């Protein structure tokens, strides 16, 4: 078990001792990250088995209605996924063809609503199709580390990508922040090798993925250490099970814990917050910003 963090503790990122100069971001990312509060990404799962809302939005009319609700609630972008990647297992892998069958009836209509859409998929074929349909961002839960095809595609399309930390299984013996940093170094190496521009990359510590519940808390507590990469940070702690480790609850009962985690992330440098509960998160972030402005 890892001990408490010292105030001076920093993640080592290879030979880098200081943050690299901030790159000129891709225009889509620049627009999202130029707001007075973190951008809010609304989650839309067109799956039967996602951990907190599986099956609710599988029908095309339900998915479109939910996308409209998320935007009305203040979502700055929509993250749509057609394969559950639920933390702690239990999801059934699906083929690229199945993902496409779930996405084809709805993606173009959601893109037409006028906010950027990210496609939550680890399959390059699915992402390629989604980009053709107007999706703006790829969200890869394996951080470009399931072969070079994804990175090469995104480089060719000049498309932004969310690079998420992940592990096949949690290991309570490791320093999770060192593991996250090393993972991101490998992802950035893949990007450089395939020509994917650094300014197209957002880093996500992957709360709940390949981590013990304590490690998810540590990743949130020490999120600011990842600013050493000089890249935007995204955090998605919405309804994750680490909340229940602090306050026992079912996924639908974790709104308070989700907001607490996201406010902590915002104070530590997160520029994008991924959530199921958009209206409440937008309100919380605005109030936090108003309080901080009075200091």
What are these regions (language model features)?
Residues 12-28, 35, 52-69, 85-116, ...:
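Active-site-adjacent loop and "lid" segments of alpha/beta metabolic enzymes
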Residues 2-16:
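Short Lys/Arg-rich cationic patches that frequently serve as NLS/NoLS or arginine-rich RNA/DNA-binding motifs
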Residues 65-81:
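Catalytic domains of carbohydrate-active enzymes, especially glycoside hydrolases
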